[in-house]
Amino acid sequence: MKNLSVFVAIFCLASLLGCRDGEDLPSTDFSITFKATYGGETLEKNKDYTFGNYPIFFEGCRMYISDIRLVNAEREVIISDVEYLDFTPENAVSATPSILFKNVPEGDYTSISIGYGVKPQLNARRPSNFPAGSPLSIEIDYWAGWKSYIFSVLDGKADPDNNGTKNLSFSYHCGSDAVYKVFEFNVPIKVKAGQFTTADIAFDMKEFLTNDDGSLYDMVANPATSNDAANVVVAQALTAHWGRATSITQ
């Protein structure tokens, strides 16, 4: 009788987990197009924008996101463990990468959850642990000294003196487990088997550089993140803005 009770408990747990990840449901392909913007306009490399009352341009904009989940009252479906997004590749002024997620269970999802950076379980590893082509095999965005991936990069120049010379270089390279942050966005996402489903996610760098009270981030006082692994104050402050800087539509 005791063995029967254990079997029933295991069966119920397995059934619950199956419902949670949606493996028992019809599925379809789901594509997300990602875009970096500035004030709602597609961000382009080396193009002048206005930051407050002075000009600014961007030289590099790329980021990791991980543990992407579709959520409703019945289940949470992990559609990706990690993705790498380069919005300013070497051979183009801008890019809007589209990623296809296969076999996504159908459902009326009420929110999407995104981890900004590389989640700790994966961040504990290093590029040599992954095969070529994996988002985590990229050496350029890994700090060996910190034992961490660089979660997001935003580089550029600005002219806070408005004298015609962009003499302020800014470099925001955010990383380490202490900086990783998850946001959940209450946006309806409908996925129906047999129908190709799409969504768009935009990351606005103007909002990323804006404080919660509406004031602009003090780029003159804090033009860069620290090289000291113990000092993540700037990185944490900026990463906290991703929730407001992200917009999702379907």
Q: Where would I find each of the regions flagged by the language model?
A:
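Positively charged n-region of N-terminal signal peptides that target proteins for export
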Residues: 1-5
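C-terminal motif of bacterial Sec signal peptides marking the signal peptidase cleavage site
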Residues: 15-18
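A short, solvent-exposed, low-complexity linear motif enriched for acidic/polar residues
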Residues: 20-250
